[in-house]
Amino acid sequence: MTISKKMLIVFVLTIFVVSFGHCSDSFPGLGLKKQAHKQCYSPDLCTGGDSKCDICCVLISGVYYGKCIQSKCHCLNKTK
């Protein structure tokens, strides 16, 4: 099975669109390294401290806990 030039372009663009749709950080690249452990959400969750952020992250998955970092809610993996 051969990969056409058109399919290769679609595949590469898909990788970039998916990786830039996640929380951005200051490191260039695909962003896959840090995104497995962290997801950013609205800064409104951090108005009253970490509690709203933590509740939101725990509801998403029991393996996350919420932490407000630079006024943004981050869901961090408990195992990392």
UniProtKB/Swiss-Prot annotation:
It comes from the Eukaryota. Keywords: Antimicrobial, Disulfide bond, Fungicide, Plant defense, Secreted, Signal. GO terms for cellular component: extracellular region. It is found in: Secreted. Belongs to the DEFL family. It comes from Arabidopsis thaliana. Residues 1-23 form the signal peptide. This is Defensin-like protein 113. Disulfide bonds join 40-75, 46-68, 53-73. Its main location: secreted. GO terms for biological process: defense response to fungus; killing of cells of another organism.
